[in-house]
Amino acid sequence: MSAAETNQLQESMEKLNIGSTTEEQSAAAATTTADQSAEEQGESSGVAENSASLYVGELNPSVNEATLFEIFSPIGQVSSIRVCRDAVSKKSLGYAYVNYHKYEDGEKAIEELNYNPIEGRPCRIMWSQRDPSARRSGDGNIFIKNLHPAIDNKALHDTFSAFGKILSCKVATDEFGQSKCFGFVHYETAEAAEAAIENVNGMLLNDREVFVGKHISKKDRESKFEEMKANFTNIYVKNIDLNYSEESFEKLFSPFGKITSIYLEKDQDGKSKGFGFVNFEDHESAVKAVEELNDKEINGQKIYVGRAQKKRERLEELKKQYEAVRLEKLAKYQGVNLFVKNLDDTIDSEKLEEEFKPFGTITSAKVMVDEAGKSKGFGFVCFTTPEEATKAITEMNTRMINGKPLYVALAQRKDVRRSQLEQQIQARNQMRMQNAAAGGLPGQFIPPMFYGQQGFFPPNGRGNAPYPGPNPQMMMRGRGQPFPEQWPRPGPNGQPVPVYGIPPQFQQDFNGQNMRPQQQQQQQPRGGYYPNRNQTSKRDLAAIISSVPQDQQKRILGEELYPKIVATGKAQEPEAAGKITGMMLGLENQEILDLLDDDELFNNHFEDALTAFEEYKKSEAAGNAEEQA
């Protein structure tokens, strides 16, 4: 908000006889006795006893636990942080929970960090309310609408905090972060909410008259809405003669019952726009007016008279109508519309129809063209019956036309086609993983292990630190245990050592970025695998892969996959990381490069491989149990 808007908010608050500023409110809060216990503070704030759990919302999807720890740990000792994620995609849901050891630290975090930007988005912090009945209670919760777009969460909080302690405050926004011009404020007490409604409802905020009222739950609103629909009194009239005045408009509807209000929409020049609203005193009068006047011709025009609807309701009805038409259209062309591709450039719509005409009655045939009118090489042919379409597919698929074999199949919508393709790829990958599991998971990737023999340098494919090996005794130590690691040492006279598997043009980058002195290695914390922060880009890795022999390509890709799999912390079996790496190396090289560059894609493939590995282990254990029996 600008300084002028902030001043206007302060002036509005002064009109309400709210003289205390934020500093004065803080000073008033500070009058609480110093020996007040955390338990008493918890009760006064409406949160659970000794609670130190905070809800942090409005987070950027890129914010993780480490980011939040850096922000919240200076306030006090943090016991735990959890960013809530989608169970399938693992993407952040935009909110998290931060737990402190002390209640006072939670209060301080709310006071100092609330509405502060985190990675470009102002966060919203409040006490975590674990009791669902308390969260859903309407006591103390108010609804504000017709807000100025410039009013954000902080401005709303500053405006309404004068009436009592606020538990949560939010301005609703769209997917682009723009205000929807309404919001909610949840007070600790119902009295504070009543005071806010009494003082702010109808008041001007940033030159807009706002409405403030008690919040009504969606369930109650829908119940009330259905009741209002069944007993409507307000009707909408359109296609009215533009020469109609308000007096003539009222005279038209007055015979049906007592009118409480009437409105005829006009433009800037005061001329009628041809529609308006009439509100009757009782439901029966409104129903009678609709029945008598709808579709009646007045001054040469058929007018429409019906129940007045809210914009949201109208949009929902239009959406349903559109969906019904779309489904009807799909049903009409189901099994009769053919997709034809690999067409010669000389084939136009007429020629296409001529080729398919022997198989039945064609309702339409069209070759798709670009802006210049040139054929795109594909088109559509629609028959009248599924039998004709099936016959055309049987006869015309792979037939040579002008030296090119046609592809003919039933036409599909783009979204259905994409969905089927994704399912086919996923099924193929799962089958590959299952086949690997059924065959005993061959092709286990064995990461290199080196013990620093004098004069010997490890053939690490990218110059990184060697990854933990498949030795069961070392792997069984569990997560967070030290792995043996030896860093490559420089050659004679401090010269970099050539790295096995890397073309000469890439040698300098890998040696220069990853050589470390032995002393620096000894100071390195020993807690398992640490990802290399000087990773080469996907483009460089692709160049490396293309320039080495075939038998070395999978080795280099394996050295990229293995640490990424270990870093997930889910491959805890002694041989799990190596087995899963071996399974994932069964993918095409380009697919591996893609999933190394895309965490979501990697997670999907990793979860499939992990599931296959676990199923294999279960079947193996069951087989061993049967043999012992």
UniProtKB/Swiss-Prot annotation:
Please give the biological process terms from Gene Ontology that the record holds. Answer: mRNA 3'-end processing; mRNA transport; nuclear-transcribed mRNA poly(A) tail shortening; regulation of nuclear-transcribed mRNA poly(A) tail shortening; regulation of translational initiation
Q: Name one GO cellular component term.
A: cytosol
**PROSITE patterns assigned:** PABC, RRM
* Record function comment: Binds the poly(A) tail of mRNA. Appears to be an important mediator of the multiple roles of the poly(A) tail in mRNA biogenesis, stability and translation. In the nucleus, involved in both mRNA cleavage and polyadenylation. Is also required for efficient mRNA export to the cytoplasm. Acts in concert with a poly(A)-specific nuclease (PAN) to affect poly(A) tail shortening, which may occur concomitantly with either nucleocytoplasmic mRNA transport or translational initiation.
Transmembrane parts of this sequence: none
From the broadest rank down, the organism's phylogenetic lineage runs: Eukaryota, Fungi, Dikarya, Ascomycota, Saccharomycotina
Q: Which UniProt keywords apply?
A: Cytoplasm, mRNA processing, mRNA transport, Nucleus, Repeat, RNA-binding, Translation regulation, Transport
Sorted alphabetically, which Pfam families does this protein's record hold? Answer: MLLE (PF00658), RRM_1 (PF00076)
Comp. bias regions, Low complexity: 20-36
- Could you tell me which residue ranges the RRM domain spans? 52-130, 140-217, 233-310, 336-413
This chain's source organism reads Candida albicans (strain SC5314 / ATCC MYA-2876)
Which protein, by its recorded name, is this?
Answer: Polyadenylate-binding protein, cytoplasmic and nuclear
Location of the protein in the cell: Cytoplasm; Nucleus
What's a Gene Ontology MF term here?
A: molecular condensate scaffold activity
